[in-house]
Structure formats: C-alpha cells, structure tokens
Amino acid sequence: MNLNKQVAIVTGGASGFGAAIARRLSQAGAAVLVADLNAEGAQRMATELNAAGGRALGMACDVSKEADYRAVVDAAIAQLGGLHIVVNNAGTTHRNKPALAVTEDEFDRVYRVNLKSVYWSAQCALPHFAQQGHGVMVNVASTTGVRPGPGLTWYSGSKAAMINLTKGLALEFARSGVRINAVNPMIGETPMMADFMGMEDTPANRERFLSRIPLGRFTRPDDVASAVAFLASDDASFLTGVCLDVDGGRNI
C-alpha cells in the first residue's frame, strides 16, 4: 500500500502497538509524528524512523489535554506539511480485578486517556480534515469492547464507548470525505500484558489466555499495524464506521 505524501499522527507511538503502527506507516511512505506521554521514547522512535529513511517528528503529548493534542496537530501541519491520518492508539487500563475493587482514580484515568483522547482528536483534527475534504482516523479499541471479560469491566466499557464513538463520528463526517474506523485487538504482547491478565506474565499464565484464542497466539504489534495501515490507505476507501477485530477469532 502507498501512503506517499501522507502525514500521520500516532499517539502512544513510543512502544507496543503504537511503535509498530508508526513503523508500518513510515514504511508505506507517510511522514509520522510520534506522540507519547514518554517524550524520550517518542524522540527515540522518530530518530529510528528517520534513520531508516523516513520523515518523522517526536513530541510529548498527554492525549487527555486539549493543549497537548492541539500542539501535536499544529506541529504536524506546520513541520511535516499537512495532516491526513490520525491514529488514536494511546490507551491505558486498570489491573484485571473485580469491578468494585477499581478505585475512582483508576476509573478516571482509564476514561480520561481512552475516551477524552478521542474527544480532543475530534475537536482538533476533524475540522482540518473536513476543510480539506479528506482524512482518516483510526481508533485502537479492543475486543473487550465487544465481548467483555471478568476483571476488566471498566476498561471494557471505555473501549465499547470508543467503538460507538467511532461509528457515530463516521456517520457525522462521511459527507465531508472523512473516514473513521477502529481496530479491536485481543490481548497483545505489550508492556500492559500483566495488567490485562491480572497476574505475573509467565508462560503458564499466558497459556490460560491462549486457550481462548482459536488461532492459538496473542495479538502481535505487527498484526495491529497491518490492520491500521490498511484502514488508513486508499485500499479501504469505501470503509467507514468499521471496527475490525484483530483477535485470531476470539470474538467468533
């Protein structure tokens, strides 16, 4: 797929799914602004992409804050020459535990990062997309937003809301030439795996979760990156409001 002359923002792009997404978009020809709460990690990823022949910029960003998100959008336009793709990948979870054991602070953090980020991306990026008559947003949701499991109730609710927001925004902005889709990964090999499992990340504990996945493995960062790159490309030009499961059959 060809993303030449496209400029993309990837939030949470310093590690995990986000890093793989940033690499894949860069390999496809897009200039990439890597935004992450970890400023050093964002700069490191941008340096990697530039060294590989891409064009990238790294910035610190708290996606729950308007000023931070707007600064990232403005930087993409001013320093990379435009904005055509926004990937809302930054996210967080509470540790896997009973719903009533989740504290108010944990609840607020999950909803602030997972949902307010979509609000600010819409406020900051969608007017630009609508004005230029085209643009793509891809939200990284979760299979738990479709099929919740015990121990992740509040996290699952945040991802279900993200999926519904994706569809609502897709309807509202379709006539402006803007496509808005989501991907729903299964539990993946990222630094948050222990939190999702609610136990130490060991081979034995992983096996308990693998038994639920028909294809017999966890979601890999490259799986998510491939799905995001497809949805961001013209190969998916007639897809909007789609929530693509990247889960090895978990949601069947």
From Swiss-Prot:
Substrate binds at residue 142. This is 4-formylbenzenesulfonate dehydrogenase TsaC1/TsaC2. Gene3D superfamilies: NAD(P)-binding Rossmann-like Domain (3.40.50.720). NAD(+) binds at residues 9-36, 62, 159. It catalyses: 4-formylbenzenesulfonate + NAD(+) + H2O = 4-sulfobenzoate + NADH + 2 H(+). Homodimer. SUPFAM superfamilies: NAD(P)-binding Rossmann-fold domains (SSF51735). One of its GO terms (molecular function) is 4-formylbenzenesulfonate dehydrogenase activity. Keywords: Aromatic hydrocarbons catabolism, NAD, Oxidoreductase, Plasmid. The keyword Ligase does not apply. Its EC number is 1.2.1.62. GO terms for biological process: catabolic process. Belongs to the short-chain dehydrogenases/reductases (SDR) family. The keyword RNA-binding does not apply. It comes from Comamonas testosteroni (Pseudomonas testosteroni). The active site is at residue 155. Involved in the toluene-4-sulfonate degradation pathway. Does not discriminate between the sulfonate and the carboxyl substituents and can also be involved in the p-toluenecarboxylate degradation pathway. PROSITE patterns: ADH_SHORT (PS00061).
